[in-house]
Amino acid sequence: MRRFLALSVTVLALTACASTPPKVQRSEFEDIPVPKGLAVDLNRSTIIESPTVKAARIFYKGRIEPDSLGVAFRTTLEANGWKHLSSTTSSDKGTTQVYEKQGSSLQVLIYESWYYTWVEMSATRMVGSASAQLRQ
């Protein structure tokens, strides 16, 4: 009986120490970092590409405090050259942050459900010749 108990404890301890490899954060735009702890929900997300425009509405979910998530987004986006235009917070609709960068726009909506904190990122970017015309 003691052997069985010792074996059971050992097996439980070893399986508790096992970990899955970290998920790579997915972002359709290389200059829009996604904070760790968020998982993309591809069933709710939409990505559209044309010769002149790339647009995406991507949903992420996680168990992160919304206020700290808002600070993390603002800090990392500004570090990547995004200009913060505005932020609004509403008790029933969460926090909306709006950013711009040459040829690109981004809206980040952070809100809570009963279990997850959700992030809805809507981004558009001019690509190809349309982007070159904007720079002139």
Task: Give the location of each predicted region.
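An acidic-aromatic pocket/loop used at catalytic or ligand-binding sites
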Residues: A18-Q136
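Bacterial N-terminal signal peptides that target proteins for export
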Residues: M1-S8
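Detector for intrinsically disordered, low-structure N-terminal pre-sequences
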Residues: S8-T10, K23
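C-terminal motif of bacterial Sec signal peptides marking the signal peptidase cleavage site
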Residues: A13-A16
